[in-house]
């Protein structure tokens, strides 16, 4: 799979609650970054198992559907820049999430080396019921 296909596949895995499958798309030394994470939250996770420790609770706390996936063309098949929308529901709070994302993926040999995810953390905080509830997902607490 090229980087665009991997990004689309990764979104489907998250929609299906398969956080382990999502993490398995990463190279063992892959990196997940959230440049706009709120102060005090980690912005970088290095290594597939560290990413899994961060993402493992995602399906328990949030269901999401992604739509309007668009890509910005690049000359490199191992680089994808995607823009998409996500609508979700926080399982515990019942809060609704409407979020727009921009994700940059760098891949090699069908694995994610870098997934840089840009999103508005305030929308997640609102949907999840505040800072403490959001920390359970975002920080893997």
Swiss-Prot record:
Spans traversing the lipid bilayer: none
InterPro entries: NTF2-like_dom_sf, SnoaL-like
Pfam families, per database record: SnoaL_2
Family, similarity comment: Belongs to the PhzA/PhzB family.
Designated name of the protein: Uncharacterized PhzA/B-like protein PA3332
